[in-house]
């Protein structure tokens, strides 16, 4: 089954994620439909979960935090991230799954 939660768009990468804030530990759970499912320790208060997501993704992918941007979903569990990186879609999938 092919999921398109990660794709190239105009020279950058876009990743669709489904976030579960307030978890015991931050981790990638797997694929959920057309999104990557991620549990985060941070609570969904005052943008803390969004900040934690950017830190988590940047560490997993080995990119700078400023290269990860939240495009959509500031107040939703469904989010779209844009990553400025030379990584391929296959490399991103390998590092996150």
What are these regions (language model features)?
Residues 1-55, 63-65, 69-74, 79-97:
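Contiguous, often N-terminal, cationic amphipathic patches that form binding interfaces
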């Amino acid at each position: 089954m092919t999921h398109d939660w990660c794709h190239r768009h105009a020279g950058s990468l876009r990743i669709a994620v489904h976030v579960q804030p307030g978890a015991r530990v931050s981790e990638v759970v797997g694929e959920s439909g057309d999104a990557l499912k991620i549990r985060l320790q941070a609570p969904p208060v005052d943008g803390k979960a969004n900040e934690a997501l950017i830190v988590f993704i940047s560490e997993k992918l080995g990119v700078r935090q400023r290269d990860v941007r939240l495009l959509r979903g500031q107040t939703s569990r469904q989010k779209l991230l844009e990553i400025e990186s030379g990584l391929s879609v296959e490399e991103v999938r390998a590092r996150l799954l």
